[in-house]
Amino acid sequence: MAVNLQKGQRVSLDDSMKMALVGLGWDTNRYDGGFDFDLDASAFLLGADGKCLKDEDFIFYNNLNGRNGAVVHQGDNLTGEGEGDDEVIVIDFSKIPDEIQKIAICVTIHDAVARRQNFGQVSNAYIRVAKIANEFDMAGEDQIRFDLEEEFSIETALVVCEIYKKNGEWKFNAVASGFQGGLEALVRNYGLSC
């Protein structure tokens, strides 16, 4: 049974978890803006200073595989329609380089400014972390669930959670921190240039 977290709560990951499926889901509210919503999940592999060490430490729809294959994005869902996970990221903890101390899992709205969209128009957003046996196991056993209940009226990017290493143990931090400026703002925040 999964542990349900609230914003700011932290929990240790199961010691036996070698691979994790990170599933993200959401619904978009109907509105009369004329544009479809395209939300995108991404992951940033971070060093001790909270910054990416290399460009390939940024995993998103144009770079699906992170360094050493440690983090793999399962592809961009352009509509977010349907039940269940809208986008999935798989983490293989055995492949994460030693210098990586944290993985930030984020969601952004593609072309948010031009489309006049923000996270205030998104509902039922969640993240779940499941223990999986291999990269083909897309169900797994849920360990953690975090429902984002906060209202984000102007934000176009969210840091949903951080999976971080402390004293050799991987932990989960329910962050839910909003940004204006979309993906570009997150990229700069994590030490990369656009």
Language-model features: where?
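Intrinsic-disorder/low-complexity signal
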Residues: 1-194
